[in-house]
Amino acid sequence: MTKFPKETNMEGLKELALSLLYLDIQKTKFSPMVVSHPFTNNGITAQIVNGEVKTLNIFENKDDLNTWRKGMEDIINKTDKPYSLYFLINKPYALVFVKFAMPYLSQKDFSSLLSDAWTRTEMPSNDSNFKPSEFIKLFKSADKRFLMETDELQQYEELPDTVTVYRGVKSDRPNKVLQLSWTLDPDKAEWFAKRFDEDGVVYEATIDKKNILALFSRRDESEIIVDLDYLRDLTEYEIPSEDMSQVQ
């Protein structure tokens, strides 16, 4: 059982953020315009310096990088709420930030931030920084009252004791079926299977409600987060022929 502080430790969060700020800027194939870093994906950015807007090339110019970091330090040190600090984080790094911020967060704040980070991230199950078991541990540590929005929690509470779930994967990646993210909607699973105009496969399985870690409907995906150890009756779902005829 994870032990959370009663109140979020903002000083601890700020120290974490400052350590992330000084990580190296990572090159991408679109650099110098696009980079990878916990606080930005822009290699060319603008910042107010001495009352004037200045263009900074933080990828190629060390002085510009130092200027940008000093400005970000000031912003970080002035934040007084966990959400204000969290929203400074570059979206691809949101889940990693929540993972390392966990020791400083109250359970309420942790649950809320985990929920937002998961639903903001494109294909979070594929994040190479996490094993499925790590995600399961994070979700099990969360309080469902703050992990889900009010309507989502109500939908979760109304689920039957045993639930049928679906997942769409590319036909050449059947191993990807063993992930946390499933859906209640077979049509949505089919969409994910076909989203890149490739042949895909939809799987169905059953799971007891007590082993469902979260339900997220905010992206219109009827997403179900499951504890993989308790999935059963995994089979390939036969897509109805009338649906297949609509796939171009």
Locate the predicted segments by residue:
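Conserved NAD+-utilizing ADP-ribose enzyme module
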Residues: 1-164, 171-180, 186-248
